Amino acid sequence: MLRNLLLLLLPLLIEAKLPPFFLGRLNGKTLLNHHLDRLTASDGASIQETYPNLQVHNFTQKLDHFDPYNTKTWNQKYFYNPVFSRNNSIIFLMIGGEGPENGKWAANPNVQYLQWAKEFGADVFDLEHRFFGDSWPIPDMQTSSLRYLTTQQALADLAFFIEFMNQQYGFKNPRWVTFGGSYPGSLAAWFRQKYPQLTVGSVASSAPVNLKLDFYEYAMVVEDDLRITDPKCAQATKDAFVQMQKLALTAEGRNSLNNHFNLQPPFDANTTKLDINNFFGNIFNTYQGMTQYTYDGQSNSTHSDKTVRKMCDIMTNATETDVVMRVENLFLWFNQMEPASANLTVMPNSYWDVISQVGSGDLNVLGPDGAAARGWMWLCCNEIGFLQTTNQGNNVFGTGVPLNLFIDMCTDMFGDSMKMSQIMGGNKKSQNYYGGADFYNATNVVLPNGSLDPWHALGTYGTIKSQSLLPYLINGTAHCGDMYPSYDGEPGSLLAARAFVKENVRQFIRYDPNVDGPGGSSSSASLFVVAYIVCGFLFV
């Protein structure tokens, strides 16, 4: 049960005490927007000052696409970039995800798909996800209101948006291609399943389509990455976690952990198993954050510094004989780039602080970061799962992050209507609806994944060339690595991967430079037909 007193905490406390990395995402931002903020750091100029041709609009969206008697509407935010348009009805749509959209994915000409937009003469849109950023179907996040925050409603939002834009901008024989990375990549993949008539293709980067509730495979891939980088790194990590778990068993040992990590609040005589699990979750977050970003093109730090290699250098530093001290050094180093609090030496250590911050349905109490974290947690608890545990048996991280930690979070954040049976039922229903990885079936979709990315374990890898269902595993890259600008010294596999994606986008839109290029006439573009295969799925 939530502690009512803690729900009165100010938004300032929310931003100060949420862990920087929460269920595979940076707090307050989608993974993509976090990366692009680093890539395009400026002197504080607004997005429209930096990109004056970028337009920001709202349009009238339906509240409930599946209840014909519900006529309520709301304003959904989108960005429109006409700079590359040659009026040939080629349209690229970036799908917004689990945080605010800031417009950079519609405007920054250096990201890969905007380079293709320039070459192909595409109009570009970026649609913000319902219940994130400035797009509020209902002006609160009470559990009763969040019934409208589902993947099916989000996909229907996309469909209604495309139909509306076709009319508003007068697109003739439109050739829409959707793009998304991470959770929006899942939406891009599922949109090709459920609404194939509205687009000619999708690029679903790092898209988890297998809706695992207990996502222990995440930790397995992190461990594999450590072993690939340096077998001694994996062993040092295991030794450290074994030692920390031993320390957690006694009052003296817990006091040692207090001193190592400057835990606030510290472990004391009232420490519970839940507190211990929460601590190990915070330690595991550091490994998650390092691995998920490794070698991507977001900034100089991820090119060569904020990498698995650097993490392993710290964990195998022979001059430091105390393996727990190595983990402390890793936390302090990571915390400089992703601060957990204003004091870079402090590790926030209160399970109930997180619950109080994300458990409120009041937007004024939540603040921007708390609202985004609550929305993401709802999606995970209510249907998509992705709960990142260390439940995989014998492993380097031990058993400190069990599924029950997240089940408790779901119940404590959303109430008694969100208990184990409801969580499992909602997850199974969505898995059956979309088919999971084994039964994913669509036409004209490219699904790139990075081999080092823990999320690739939930991808689909069954190629069907006849219907252009095209998974692509990129060796030596991590989360959404294919989407960023190229850089000197990047993994060599990215060059071929980007060329593969681009060529298939070209085929999806049936690009003809004689018609679609400069001086081409959109009126002479031929109407084409794409064959679609639609699968039926079992509803539970």
Swiss-Prot record:
It comes from the Eukaryota. It is an enzyme of class 3 (hydrolase). GO terms for biological process: innate immune response; proteolysis. GO terms for cellular component: membrane raft. Glycans are attached at N58, N87, N270, N300, N317, N343, N441, N449, N475. InterPro entries: AB_hydrolase_fold, Peptidase_S28, Ser_carbopepase_S28_SKS. The active site is at S182, D453, H479. Keywords: Glycoprotein, Hydrolase, Protease, Serine protease, Signal. Its EC number is 3.4.-.-. SUPFAM superfamilies: alpha/beta-Hydrolases. The keyword Protease applies. GO terms for molecular function: dipeptidyl-peptidase activity; serine-type exopeptidase activity. Residues 1-16 form the signal peptide. It holds the Pfam family Peptidase_S28. PANTHER family: PROTEASE S28 PRO-X CARBOXYPEPTIDASE-RELATED, SERINE PROTEASE F56F10.1-RELATED. Belongs to the peptidase S28 family. This is Putative serine protease F56F10.1. It comes from Caenorhabditis elegans.
